[in-house]
Design a protein with these regions (language model features):
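Interhelical loop segments of eukaryotic multi-pass membrane proteins
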Residues: 147-170, 338-345, 357-365, 389-396, ...
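Juxtamembrane/interfacial segments around transmembrane helices
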Residues: 184-188, 367-371, 493-502, 517-529, ...
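Hydrophobic alpha-helical transmembrane segments corresponding to the first two to three helices
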Residues: 293-430, 435-452
Length: 675
């Protein structure tokens, strides 16, 4: 039978005995812990920081206020924001970036120098020994050629020649030689042993140089040539040159030395000459002058020695050295520093040395410029060049592209100097033939190269960084341009420093640009030093015309024997240059013959009234020597007069030359200044 209501077995629950004291402590700890839970509803927070329970009023006024960025963004049209976003994405480049590397053409051929070195000099010590031997061979050959070119050139009877630059001369421009030229003596009966460099025909004067009523510009300053009159000296071709002629260009013009090799010889001062011929000889043009000049010179026959400018023979050891370093070196530091050092000293001492009369002085200048140049080189190597040369094994391509371009830049005086731009100034670009088209071509080439390099930066994902760097460069240049009283001048060494960071890729175009810019930097520092990027107008002009106020000259009396000029009143204020002139200087045949000031009555013909209508009388040259009027007229030599104001000891622009003809007639000055 089933027993539905029958109770089951009893369940026994055993409750353990609890310690009331322990339980109390447990509950107390839990309560304390719960107080420090980091919740917004924590009611245990007291004081001013306690959160109040939100009310309906709070919920109605709690709309979030937009930030200023959001307010500006809301006002920008969506099409602009989309375009900006796409531009930013494009500038950042592909993801992941693609890093340029050069895969050599004909790798077996290009790796042959490295394989040869691995086979015969596998150990590091062996390679260091070979490198040291190469350094020693270059230094020895370079030093011997330099010694032969500079020291071993004594001229018997005259001693060691003085080293001249292509623009060396006796007579200075304007009134720099003083009244009657006394600061540029001697005029005659003295000789000078000299040495001239090669290729002086390429050196041209940038500012107009006055020769009577003519001007020489963009060609060598040579006045004279073979003369009809005898000088009393045994001169080469009886060629006589005016004292303001460039000595080395005149020596080439006379046929005394070769323009290709330069040379040594002896110059003889021949005093005053009545006139000077002209004409082109040995690719050097000469300007004639139809009147007298107190100082002249020629070149003594039989004094030419076998000394030569060995810049081309000295190129061979340095060129071979750089080629060997490039072919057999994969270490970027060894490659860069070896080539940089030898290029620098080759330019500074051989191919384009600065002007200095002794080689000891030349070496001193070279070392003085080398240390700061080396610091700049370290910066560009560390942040630009090292990236291009690291792991580059295309030895032949590296030699042709990088080293070849470096030589093109370092020999700037034979490569880019042929471009008809002497200085990047508005005056020169306007005045020099061919300068404007050349500048346009250069700018277009730079733009094309810059676009190509910008694309490479984008491909490598580095465009944003370099846009910032070059933006900073541009901003700095704009600030420099805005500084009053100074002019911005970008020298070619500065161009190298600015553009070198933009070549930090390992691709073939960048190797060419990098080598070229490094060569330009080396040439700029070794030849000219760290010329300032900001120059004063006076320093930038360097003998150019100032566009100053010119004297208003009148003829008061004139005859065949003398002439009297009215010079106006002094002092005179020049509002354009903000300068007050208290004196006047007069050049006769490009020699200062008078210098007078407003406070000195002694100098003027009419000393009774100071400051008013100054006059000055000049007697024709030769009258003081006892020659009669008929003798003076028969000689037929005109005289050329130029007038310029002075402020203290500083002269302003001179007028163009007025001509006092031998028959007593006067030809007025053309408008405009001269120098």
């Amino acid at each position: 039978m089933e027993r539905d209501n029958e109770p089951g077995p009893a369940t026994i629950i055993v409750t353990p005995k609890v310690d009331n004291e322990a339980a109390l402590r447990h509950h107390t700890n839990l309560a304390q812990a719960s107080r420090y839970r980091d919740e917004s509803s924590d009611d245990d927070t007291i004081g001013p920081g306690r959160l109040r329970t939100p009310t309906e009023f709070d919920r109605q006024g709690s709309a979030a206020r937009a930030s200023w960025q959001q307010q500006i963004s809301s006002r920008i049209p969506s099409i602009v924001k989309k375009g900006w976003a796409k531009t930013v994405t494009w500038v950042k480049g592909p993801q992941p970036p693609r890093i340029y590397t050069i895969t050599p053409f004909f790798p077996k051929l290009q790796h042959a120098p490295i394989a040869l070195l691995d086979r015969y000099a596998p150990r590091t010590i062996q390679r260091i020994a070979l490198l040291a031997a190469l350094y020693c061979l270059w230094l020895m050959s370079f030093s011997l050629l330099l010694w032969k070119s500079s020291v071993a050139a004594e001229i018997p009877g005259y001693g060691n020649p003085i080293r001249l630059s292509c623009t060396a001369r006796y007579w200075e421009d304007g009134n720099a030689c003083g009244v009657d030229g006394n600061l540029c003596r001697p005029f005659s009966n003295t000789s000078l042993a000299f040495r001239c460099p090669a290729d002086c025909h390429k050196v041209q004067v940038s500012n107009p140089h006055a020769v009577g009523d003519q001007e020489i510009v963009y060609k060598p300053v040579v006045v004279g040539g073979p003369a009809d009159q005898q000088t009393g000296f045994d001169l080469v071709d009886n060629a006589v040159y005016r004292g303001d002629s460039w000595i080395c260009a005149s020596a080439v013009h006379s046929g005394f030395i070769s323009d290709f090799e330069g040379g040594c010889g002896v110059l003889q001062m021949t005093g005053e000459q009545p006139s000077f011929t002209g004409g082109t000889r040995s690719n050097i043009p000469s300007t004639p002058f139809s009147s007298y000049f107190p100082q002249s010179f020629g070149f003594l026959s039989g004094t030419k020695t076998q000394c030569k400018d060995l810049r081309w023979p000295a190129l061979a050891p340095t060129l071979v050295f750089t080629i060997l370093i490039s072919l057999f070196t994969t270490n970027p530091a060894v490659h860069f520093w070896s080539i940089f050092v030898v290029l620098f000293f080759h330019v500074a001492l051989v191919s384009d040395p600065p002007s200095n009369t002794t080689y000891y002085g030349l070496v001193s200048v070279a070392f003085g410029r080398f240390l700061p140049a080396a610091f700049c080189a370290w910066v560009v190597y560390r942040y630009a060049i090292k990236r291009s040369l690291t792991h580059l094994t295309a030895q032949v391509e590296k030699t042709i592209l990088w080293v070849g371009a470096a030589w093109v830049g370092a020999l700037n005086n034979y490569t880019f100097d042929r471009i008809p731009i002497q200085r990047l100034t508005p005056h020169d670009i306007k005045a020099q033939p061919g300068a404007l088209p050349a500048l346009i071509i250069i700018i277009l080439a730079i733009i094309c190269i810059a676009l190509g390099q910008a694309w490479a930066f984008r491909v490598e994902g580095r465009m944003p960084k370099y846009l910032g760097i070059y933006g900073l460069f541009v901003l700095t240049l704009l600030i420099f341009m805005a500084i009053p009283g100074l002019n911005l001048r970008i020298h070619h060494y500065i161009l190298g420093l600015i553009f070198l960071p933009g070549t930090s890729f390992q691709n073939r175009p960048s190797l060419v640009y990098q080598g070229l810019l490094l060569g330009l930097f080396v040439n700029g520092i070794a030849r000219w030093g760290f010329a300032p990027i900001l120059e004063t107008p006076a320093s930038l002009l360097k003998g150019a015309q100032l566009e100053s106020l010119l004297p208003a000259v009148t003829i008061l009396a004139i005859s065949a024997k003398n002439i009297t000029f009215g010079l106006g009143s002094l002092p005179v204020y020049d509002s354009k240059l903000d300068n007050t002139y208290d004196g006047i200087s007069i050049l006769v045949n490009d020699v200062e013959r008078f210098r007078g000031f407003s406070d000195d009555a002694y100098h003027w013909d009419d000393s009774t009234v100071l400051g008013k209508n100054y006059t000055w009388t000049w007697n024709r040259h030769g009258i003081e020597d006892g020659k009669g009027e008929e003798d003076v007229l028969s000689e037929g030599f005109p005289e050329y007069f130029r007038f310029g104001y002075m402020a203290g000891s500083d002269s302003a622009d001179y007028t163009k030359a007025g001509v006092w003809a031998s028959d007593g007639s006067w030809m007025e000055m053309k408008p405009g200044p001269s120098k």
